[in-house]
């Protein structure tokens, strides 16, 4: 019996054209992927950016030169500020800069860039609190600005970008990180800026793929990707501040490759995996691995140029031959000495474990970071006579609870909307958060502190802003006339909830301001604001 619906069966039946009442079955057409939506930058974006930047600058400059330890640095400033001053004093030319020669605190265990940036402020304003804190404050403002820009790019929403920036302004971790002459603020800035450029590359790759002709088995070549190159530059700068920048190179590199694979698969490339490996991965390796590596080496230029930098001639002075790595002696002196320095630093970091007897009263493990359970004390002055009672001045690296206590819920929610609603806006902040959190779980025996979590803060702010966008669309119109009159338009219960939340963030920031700025307070007020035993 002939098979109905085929050309052969129709010809055997002597039928021309369509059979009355019968429709030829066809496969459903695949819906063409849509291009990324881009809303042009407008005047309202500039206004939002100016407001957030102004608030960030104000909050970070207030009390910037206080406190000190009798005019000298406090906390870990004692390491980095003298090292930066060494660079100023040994300055030879603007290309090379100076070197760290201060041996008072042992081996210099972080790359030079953070100290080089501190040295700019000290060069301009001298060895003063303003000199060693002005650059962190400015980079702290930049971190808030890029948090806004990242959210604006991901959501294409002025309002949500403004919300992310506003939350970042009033986060205690980002505030305190920006008020002291330490390194973390520089790395946080470069990381959040790298996330912004990576988001730009992902959008650009999507647009190029959408407009390309899909031919061959491997799909189109997408050309040189300047946003990805910029990401590599910023990741190289992050690595040149602290080695933990390596985690972001790995996570951002994998995200870039898998995004390209998803695009090729989404646009119907016959062999998307091979196409990604051949046409995307080599260029990604050049931009996201080679470029950061070259920039990292360049950050050591003053060390290579100097004759007196630490371990500069470890190969020829016998240091290497008596070490655990004598094989380095086969390499050229500069290379061998530089690698010996790095292996010595790696050995130092590996030795800072609880099991080997190292301990610190403010040690904090990664799971505690998720709720800001263990802040870290930066400054303390107690038993101050203030009339009818005693007072104190305290500064903690302390996360605003209205932000940090929502970290776990917003992470779970973001993963859910990614997996169930395919909301790709959360991908970059989620992966960036993972890069700053997951690797530390593998090293849980190591001494760790809450300032390691500083790079998590901008991405928490962005995810909270995206969640706020969902909440704002919920609910019904608030039936109160005064609310509508005050707003000038009908306000939904979801929008009202967002307003209440933002007010809570600002209110908590003000409530905890004494332990963020070192404001003198009575002991009884200190007891009131230290809610948890682990905060003390």
Name every feature range the model reports, one short phrase each.
Residues 56-59, 164-169, 176, 235, ...:
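Short helix- or helix-capping micro-motifs
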Residues 48-53, 147-170, 207-222, 427:
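Transmembrane-helix signature of polytopic, membrane-embedded enzymes
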Residues 13-16, 34, 154-155, 194-227, ...:
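Membrane-interface transmembrane helices that cradle and orient dolichyl/undecaprenyl
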Residues 61-67, 77-116, 120:
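Extracytosolic helix-loop segments that constitute the early lumenal/periplasmic catalytic or substrate-binding loops
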Residues 3-6, 14-19, 23-26, 219-227, ...:
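Transmembrane helical bundles and short interhelical boundary loops of multi-pass, membrane-embedded
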Residues 134-155, 193, 410:
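Transmembrane-helix motifs of polytopic, lipid-linked glycan transferases
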Residues 41-77, 289-307, 504-512:
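Transmembrane signal-anchor helices characteristic of membrane glycosylation enzymes that use polyprenol
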Residues 136, 173-186, 241-244:
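Short acidic/glycine- and proline-prone juxtamembrane loop motifs at membrane-interface regions
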